[in-house]
Amino acid sequence: MGAIGGDEVVQWDKMDGGEVVNGGGGGGVGKLERILVSVRLRPLSDKEIARGDPSEWECINDTTIISRSTFPDRPSAPTAYSFDRVFRSDCDTNEVYKQGAKEVALSVVSGINSSIFAYGQTSSGKTYTMTGITEYTVADIYDYIGKHEERAFVLKFSAIEIYNEVVRDLLSAENTPLRLWDDAEKGTYVENLTEVVLRDWNHLKELISVCEAQRKTGETYLNENSSRSHQILKLTIESSAREFLGKDKSTTLVASVNFVDLAGSERASQALSAGARLKEGCHINRSLLTLGTVIRKLSKVRNGHIPYRDSKLTRILQPSLGGNARTAIICTMSPARSHMEQSRNTLLFASCAKEVVTNAQVNVVMSDKALVKQLQKELARLESELRCPASYSSLESLVKEKDNQIRKMEKEIKELKLQRDLAQSRLQDLLQVVGDNHVHVSKQSSVSGRNFTFDVPQTCEDEQSTTESSEVVDSVQNFRFQGRRVAQREHKPQQAENNVQFTTPSRYSVSSPPFSGMLPTNRSDHLSQISNEDSDDICKEVRCIETNETGGNECLESSAVGSNSLQDPNAGSSMHINNDSNSSMNSRLRDESPVTLEQHLENVRKPFANIVKDLGSSTRNSSSSKVLGRSRSCRSLTGSSLFEDLEKDDCTPPNRSFIDFAGRPQNCQRRGSALNYDAESETLSRAGSMLSEITTTRDGLKANSSVAGDTEFTGIGEFVAELKEMAQVQYQKQLGHSGNGDLAEGTIRSVGLDPITDALQSPSRWPLEFEKKQQEIIDFWHACNVSLVHRTYFFLLFKGDPADSIYMEVELRRLSFLKDTYSNGAIASIPNTSLVSSAKKLQREREMLCRQMQRRLSIEERESMYTKWGVSLASKRRRLQVARCLWTETKDLEHVRESASLVARLIGLLEPGKALREMFGLSFAPQQFTRRSYNSWRYGRSSLN
């Protein structure tokens, strides 16, 4: 006999009155519930009325009983008590049964053990109450059996009494004491106990009458017919299906219900007992005292010793007291003032009993008939497989193939949805910029850009669709200055057909929102003076980027366009497009042959030769500095106020208007202010630079780090400072290999110029990108055995804000290199870089968290934590089990969130809101890099591993 889940139990119908009889045992674990406690107040007896004994207890509602006067010897004792149900003196036994015992008693028909107790002082109405409840319960059981003829029921009845700590069989004529035995499967049972199979309801009535006659009773001063023993009536019900209806309905349910009528506690001074009555009262009070001790210890939820074996009563009723049974206790009491102390003790017992938790399970037995049928069915299936193995294997392979197709289609559907959402967001951005005017961009017409002239004294507005070639022109015109506002021209209806039209693939076309800017009055002359001097320098820089994006011909064409637009000394005062000059230029281009065009481009390129040499020497001399080294053309422009403003803007985070600037082309992002590299720096590899950084970090950590454990944890400010330093180190490494590695990928974005601005370009895409990067980082953490404290800090700090992209990128690249390092084995120059050493450090950190659980969490909080993390309260080393569960399920984001929350609580981390507010004050723009001490990296060593 064992416990099964509720899905394997036959779901029977509801009883009359809407009571559900299915106990719904929750699988092998069972269903935890408290004991149902009720209090019944009897009316005053004739003797009490004759003595003028007033009533001191009153039921104010269905759940509360109060005392009308206080206890003189105990002024602090409570005067009000609350229970599951309180019955007034005018309530009949049928109402007590329906509201206080029916639901528990009828659980027996669904395979759940149940017990009904009657507890109270002598002459309080226990036997009267239990007699009625027994009759009502048996009547409902037989009524249920009559309504369910599809199952076969077998009822067995047994009865015992405990008189002076001696167990007797009430159904046997012999007065022989019975012995108690313990069995691993049955539990405690009575040896040679008579068990009668019931024929019907009348047969049970006859047996109950025999028990009443056999039970020990006697007359006392308080009661003419007082019970002198504890009586236990046991009704066992076995039910099984009459025919085989399937595997789920082929089990046999076995459960029993106990009707326990306890003898009443009494005082010798009040009962005036002597001789045999005094001896009986001593045994009764002793067994009831043991019962009260067991109830009190069970109510305190402690793992101490429970004295079940101190009394035969508690030993027999052990399954009903906090075991595999549903239990209801009905406490009877007298309202008379003379019994006030005894009534208060009864209420205290009831208060402890309602705190006791039981674990009721469904008891089932697999029938032989059902087991045979199940084995026959399994045998037939195996024989069919042996007869035709080919067909079975082909069917299995077909099912696997279909499953693979389904998974593949689901993956494709997910990718298509992402592409659709991305396309919709891009379309919305384009519609907002373009409005009602549709701008068609043609790459062949891009040469008309040299007809643009600077509007020196006025504000210029230009709306254009930026292509790869126009990006180069923009780079030349901006002279590599970051943060330049893109000028736009708003198209008016009368100017629509005069505008220059470009056509380019849509994936390269990004529109810019309108922005107005002012140029100094001498800007046109100044530009014309420096264009001839340093134009070769500019063309060199343009071709370095454009070679990998558009090819050599497009680069030459774009460079020619940019240089012509700068070299024109006779530019007009306003920035506009001249129809006449435009048409004449187009006709002139049509007339020229390809050879003429190539010669023209070659003539444009020749004047730049000298400036390239200056640029190379300048960049080599400034390779060790942290600030961008400029060519002579750029230095000649820095004296103006415009470029001073640009320098200020470049060293600070973008303002709000620039953050919202979503129309900047992806290949024309604002560049970092430290883009300098020479020929020697190109030899530096990414692995080498990062390896040197880790070496330096470990040297600092050896001198300053302390063992993680009992020391205090770093503050959130220090952790943010660590991330800031990591971002600066990552930026320097990007500069080291930007000359040969990243530019070869074909986009300026790969150089890592401004990932924050890039993430802000499409807000609808950033959440998906953030989730992807976050999942990759979590996987890397798990693979590299990164410190749990580092994971918690990082996870709680960055929650999807677009400004967090630089942090995510730095962490992702660091972890990627760390994983590559581990996969290649330990490095000789850096100790403790193997995966085994990092695993040992992670294990020590988990042990440290175990100690923190003991210090920072109370007993109740720890027990709640064990339950939440699925750790059994009865198991050993529970704190270590919880620590080993932390950050283990990398694919379950809820598990990760709960792990971070628990670790943050254990290490005393600040609120996430405060941490984020401090993070927002940081600026990751490249600045003078001074290596700070590593005192704050107390746990950084674990994070690197």
Swiss-Prot record:
Domain Kinesin motor per the UniProt entry, residue ranges: 34-356
GO biological process terms on file: microtubule-based movement
Keywords: ATP-binding, Coiled coil, Microtubule, Motor protein, Nucleotide-binding
Domain of life: Eukaryota
Positions that bind ATP: G120, Q121, T122, S123, S124, G125, K126, T127
Ranges of compositional bias, category Polar residues: 495-512, 560-587
PROSITE patterns per the UniProt record, alphabetical: KINESIN_MOTOR_1, KINESIN_MOTOR_2
Region annotated Disordered, chain positions: 484-512, 553-588
Coiled-coil stretches: 365-437
SMART domains tied to this protein: KISc
GO MF annotations in UniProt: ATP binding; ATP hydrolysis activity; microtubule binding; microtubule motor activity
Presence of keyword Metal-binding: no
Alphabetical list of Pfam families matching this protein: DUF3490, Kinesin
CDD domains in alphabetical order: KISc_CENP_E (cd01374)
GO cellular component terms attached to this protein's record: microtubule
Function: Binds ATP/ADP in vitro. Possesses low ATPase activity but high affinity for microtubules.
Subunit structure: Binds microtubules.
Similarity field: Belongs to the TRAFAC class myosin-kinesin ATPase superfamily. Kinesin family. KIN-7 subfamily.
Full protein name: Kinesin-like protein KIN-7F
Gene coding for it: KIN7F
